[in-house]
């Protein structure tokens, strides 16, 4: 596993994209999974789309990274629905469902909904977003008709080894009731999340288990002690890597027992112009039969568009 050179906690250490080599492998010798930060399709990003089209949001460098992967997971930070039933909260977002087709055309295969904005247009808007993602040829993650469905781990790949993603929102939702039998996003207690990871590991010792958490304090550069504790517990339960988001900043990467913990990879397609919010990264996992290579790809966001640094 390629990690920042430390046995404990480090600042983010990037791998130069130009040095990354994709082997000319035969089918199933290697699976490449790329994970990105927050994707917003409203507010300032909506203005860019109205002026230039959705395709403008994907730079050549990002397209190249996506093209090299079999699986690309983005965190969709808004509902994509025609339903307008806003929840009473400070920031309310909504993207157009027809824009999802372009996300798929540029290589995104899975969209995570286990975040604090997927419910911005209510439960009906959440389920409609889920249906719209499926209709666009992508897989929705972390949302369902009830908590049991929403919290199910998602199988990203089967060869050369199974790759699972376990999503979870670790924040309280603003003015939104926690009802486990109603449409919702994955928001189980930590004990349940640990049990999911532990069961996956017990079922298959060779599987790659990715945990994706939406958590942390916005605009901060370091996680709080409770996050570190929970992250360590997830690794001990069997997770191989944690790739998290929500803070709109690039936070510390920790090497815990040889496992990478990305406490926040920052934004991806977003409209926050401050330098603090414009530095981000993607995470690329190369899964082979005999190993897992974790690579950090630096990103700079300019006028809502992510560029490879």
Question: What are the roles of these predicted feature ranges?
Answer:
Residues 2-309:
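Acidic, metal/ion-coordinating pockets
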